[in-house]
Regions:
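Signature of alpha-helical transmembrane segments in polytopic membrane proteins
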Residues: 1-140, 172
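A solvent-exposed beta-alpha-beta segment
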Residues: 26, 133-194
Length: 194
């Protein structure tokens, strides 16, 4: 039962993040399309805004589903989130740019498209890092916790206890430890359970 709840939580985070990322991609291109009107950049756009935005959003959705989301993991660091976002945007640039160029929708080699891709990279990175921070705050306040009981009181378990309790944002709470007898070297905050 608990495993099912955790998996549904992970799926919910995945769907939410990918949907928001896709909306960011579409909204950003809408802005860039608006800014390009009545300028020299307008010549790079050979199709309607709807066709280009729909193509870009579909391409980004496919790329995001392929690379995935790691925000729900217990221990994920900012560089891992940024690496995943960068990989996703590179795949998106290749797929989306290729389809736009081959379909004759726009010139994918233009500076407008490059600026758009850089804006996508920055906005999606900021969104995902902000969401990761919110997940950390939620877990620090007691949401989505995992309760842990350690078996044994060896040096490894003491280090594991320190690792699990030093970062409350990871969402672990240690209830205590089992061993043959209480260990004086184990922290007092971790009760002996038997």
């Amino acid at each position: 039962m608990k495993r099912g709840i955790a998996e549904s939580y992970n799926r919910l985070v995945n769907v939410f993040v990918i949907a928001c990322d896709t909306c960011i991609v579409g909204g950003l291109f809408h802005r860039f399309y608006y800014w390009a009107q009545d300028t020299a950049w307008e010549k790079t756009l050979q199709a309607s805004e709807f066709q280009i935005v729909a193509t870009l959003m579909l391409c980004y959705l496919l790329c995001a589903m392929h690379t995935g989301v790691i925000l729900y993991r217990r221990k994920v660091f900012a560089y891992e989130v940024l690496t995943r976002v960068t990989k996703n945007v590179v795949f998106f640039a290749i797929l989306g740019g290729g389809i736009l160029q081959l379909g004759g929708y726009m010139d994918a080699w233009s500076k407008l498209f490059l600026a758009y891709l850089l804006a996508v990279l920055v906005c999606v990175s900021v969104f995902r890092l902000g969401l990761r921070m919110l997940i950390k705050v939620y877990r620090t306040k007691g949401g989505n916790l995992r309760y842990v009981v350690l078996v044994g009181s060896t040096d490894n378990n003491r280090e594991l206890y320190q690792e699990l309790t030093s970062q409350s944002w990871a969402g672990y709470r240690v209830l205590g430890y089992f061993d043959f007898e209480p260990n004086g070297h184990f922290p007092q905050e971790c009760p002996y359970l038997g």
